[in-house]
């Protein structure tokens, strides 16, 4: 069992955390992030920390305890620092351009792929690197996964869209018979 729920979450300066029943609201300026928790978890804000407690000793309450602690920490960290995922585009003629709030990708198909950037996310393009930034960790990861899914990297030449820290396992091509 992980016991990650035991760790208190330190609230950074400039972040305001309020609890209303089972709803945790994290606020910084005009940005608000909310986490809907389960009744099996108790929430307390004191001394600049958020402390989550289990309501009961069941296996489910332990699972919810760690999950909601992680979700709350992600909401606080997202508004404080933000999350970033970087993608690398490899291939001849493969490129990405920004046109307003649309990311246009040329990935070897007969047509360009237009991806509408969701609200709350910021996408930047530098040469062959596409960076997805935002306050919601789930939304940043989902957008990066969708962009990667347009042309996953293939194992023979490594062409496609991959995460910058992703390792592509390369395969050897066919060998000729003599």
UniProtKB/Swiss-Prot annotation:
Supply one GO CC term from the record: cytosolic large ribosomal subunit
HAMAP family, per the entry: Ribosomal_uL6_B
The alphabetized list of GO BP terms reads: cytoplasmic translation
Gene Ontology molecular-function annotations: rRNA binding; structural constituent of ribosome
Protein family according to the UniProt entry: Belongs to the universal ribosomal protein uL6 family.
Described by its record, this protein's role is as follows: This protein binds to the 23S rRNA, and is important in its secondary structure. It is located near the subunit interface in the base of the L7/L12 stalk, and near the tRNA binding site of the peptidyltransferase center.
Does the record bear rRNA-binding in its keywords? yes
The highest taxon in the source lineage is Bacteria
PROSITE patterns the record matches: RIBOSOMAL_L6_1 (PS00525)
The UniProt keyword set, sorted, is: Ribonucleoprotein, Ribosomal protein, RNA-binding, rRNA-binding
Q: List the disulfide bonds.
A: none
Q: List, alphabetically, the InterPro entries matched.
A: Ribosomal_uL6-like (IPR000702), Ribosomal_uL6-like_a/b-dom_sf (IPR036789), Ribosomal_uL6_a/b-dom (IPR020040), Ribosomal_uL6_bac-type (IPR019906), Ribosomal_uL6_CS (IPR002358)
What protein does this entry describe? Large ribosomal subunit protein uL6
The keyword Ribonucleoprotein is annotated on this UniProt entry: yes
Species per Swiss-Prot/TrEMBL record: Aliarcobacter butzleri (strain RM4018) (Arcobacter butzleri)
């Amino acid at each position: 069992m992980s016991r990650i729920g035991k760790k208190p979450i330190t609230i950074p300066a400039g972040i305001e955390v309020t609890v209303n029943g089972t709803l945790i609201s994290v606020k910084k300026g005009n940005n608000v992030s909310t986490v809907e928790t389960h009744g099996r978890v108790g929430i307390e804000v004191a001394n600049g920390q958020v402390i989550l407690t289990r309501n009961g000793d069941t296996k489910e309450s332990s699972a919810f305890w760690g999950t909601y602690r992680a979700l709350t920490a992600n909401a606080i960290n997202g508004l404080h620092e933000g999350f970033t995922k970087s993608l690398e585009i490899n291939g001849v003629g493969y490129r990405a351009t920004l046109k307003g709030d649309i990311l246009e990708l040329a990935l070897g198909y007969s047509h360009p792929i237009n991806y509408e950037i969701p609200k709350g996310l910021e996408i930047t393009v530098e040469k062959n690197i596409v960076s997805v930034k935002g306050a919601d960790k789930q939304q940043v990861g989902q957008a990066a996964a969708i962009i990667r899914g347009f042309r996953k990297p293939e194992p023979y030449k490594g062409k496609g869209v991959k995460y910058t820290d992703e390792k592509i396992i390369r395969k050897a091509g066919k060998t000729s018979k003599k």
